[in-house]
Curated annotation (Swiss-Prot):
Enzyme class: transferase
Reaction(s) catalysed (UniProt annotation): N-(5-phospho-beta-D-ribosyl)anthranilate + diphosphate = 5-phospho-alpha-D-ribose 1-diphosphate + anthranilate
Subunit structure and binding partners: Homodimer.
Entry keyword Metal-binding: yes
Job description of the protein: Catalyzes the transfer of the phosphoribosyl group of 5-phosphorylribose-1-pyrophosphate (PRPP) to anthranilate to yield N-(5'-phosphoribosyl)-anthranilate (PRA).
UniProt-recorded Gene Ontology molecular function terms: anthranilate phosphoribosyltransferase activity; magnesium ion binding
Binding site for Mg(2+) 2: D225, E226
Residues where 5-phospho-alpha-D-ribose 1-diphosphate binds: 81, 84-85, 89, 91-94, 109-117, 121
GO biological process, one term: L-tryptophan biosynthetic process
Pathway it works in: Amino-acid biosynthesis; L-tryptophan biosynthesis; L-tryptophan from chorismate: step 2/5
Listed name of the protein: Anthranilate phosphoribosyltransferase
GO cellular component terms, A-Z: cytosol
Names of the cofactor(s): Mg(2+)
Organism, as annotated: Rhizobium leguminosarum bv. trifolii (strain WSM2304)
Length: 338
């Protein structure tokens, strides 16, 4: 079927779509076969009614079928957030990814430019000297040689160009804000996944379970799409096919609580400078929150069993220079420097 109208009519009637219907509808959207008005109407009908797990699974399946893939080790992990929390923090998941790579776990980092902040992962890494517009072979080399590779979302999900203008005109959150982090071009099955609202914790854990993920922690920390050190982090953890919910506090990581102002960053250049300060030994709130996210990622990856063991290994990665070396190698390989 190449006509969105039947799916639009069903969504407008507040009826949920089946997985197959959602996949078919999003195939149409991402193949350029729907008009801007149809795209906007369909996305808002889903948003107002509330997207279901089956609809998200179907949409992700469609998106994954069209993406440019990257070969990565089976045990690779992604540390990624939906964005959209409007917090303007430092690039926490970026530094956490480098720490995890330095600790010996391969990272296939998926990200984009800023959504609601001044600096997304792509902005931050570009300011650090990482080349973004590279092909799958170079990214695979980055993961193999640096321990971490960056997949620039817009290069791997070119089908999104068909819905981009409608999303901009709508100017509000749609299901597409959720789909990117769920559609890793490297097909990772282990993730630390931050979400902009706690309402999505369990639903997205269910989505990842149904899509075959092994271990995923979906997290929301005190308004952030990260594990936070400003207060309580809510977690829905998918492990061995089961989902459990729990909370984490700064004390669980052995760090002192901070306030949002302590981790608020600037643009890509400013955040790159802050990241390099931590690599050079700065002991501050940015270091603490990045270590916390890295520690959880090391648990998810199966590298350690406990958060505290994860903190120890993450700190060793930073303090030994292994994290800085991972960044140096990522810059060199992405720029194809021997």
């Amino acid at each position: 079927m190449t006509d969105l109208k039947p799916f639009l009519a069903k969504a407008a009637s507040r009826e949920p779509l089946t997985r197959d219907e959602a996949r078919a509808a999003f195939d149409i959207l991402m193949s350029g076969q729907a008009t801007p008005s149809q795209i906007g109407g369909f996305l808002m009908a889903l948003r107002v009614r509330g997207e279901t797990v089956d609809e998200i699974v179907g949409a992700v399946t469609a998106m994954r079928s069209k993406m440019l893939t990257v070969e990565a080790p089976e045990d690779a992990i992604d540390i990624v957030g939906t964005g959209g929390d409007a917090s303007g923090t430092y690039n926490i998941s970026t530094l956490a990814a480098l720490i995890v790579a330095g600790a010996g776990v391969p990272v296939a980092k998926h990200g984009n430019r800023a959504l609601s902040s001044k600096s997304g992962a792509a902005d931050n890494l570009a300011a650090l000297g990482v080349k973004l517009d590279v092909g799958p072979e170079i990214i695979s080399r980055c993961i193999a040689e640096a321990g971490v590779g960056f997949m620039f979302a817009q290069l791997h999900h070119s089908a999104m160009r068909h819905v981009g203008p409608s999303r901009v005109e709508l100017g509000t959150r749609t299901i597409f804000n959720l789909l990117g982090p769920l559609s890793s071009p490297a097909g990772v099955r282990r993730q630390l996944l931050g979400v902009f609202s706690p309402q999505w914790l369990v639903p997205l854990a269910e989505v990842m379970r149904d899509l075959g993920s092994e271990c995923v922690w979906v997290v929301h920390g005190d308004g952030l799409d990260e594990i936070t050190t400003t207060g309580i982090t809510k977690v829905a953890a998918l492990e061995d096919g089961k989902i459990r919910t729990f909370e984490l506090s700064p004390a669980d990581f052995g760090v002192s609580p901070c306030v949002l102002a302590d981790i608020r960053g600037g643009d890509g250049v400013a955040n790159a400078a802050a990241l390099r300060e931590v690599l050079s030994g700065a002991k501050n709130a940015y270091r603490d929150i990045s270590l916390a996210n890295a520690a959880a990622s090391l648990v998810i990856a199966g590298k350690v069993e406990t958060i505290r063991d994860g903190m120890t290994l993450a700190a060793q990665s930073l303090d030994s220079g292994a994290t800085a070396l991972a960044l140096d190698k990522l810059i060199a390989v992405s720029n194809d420097i021997d």
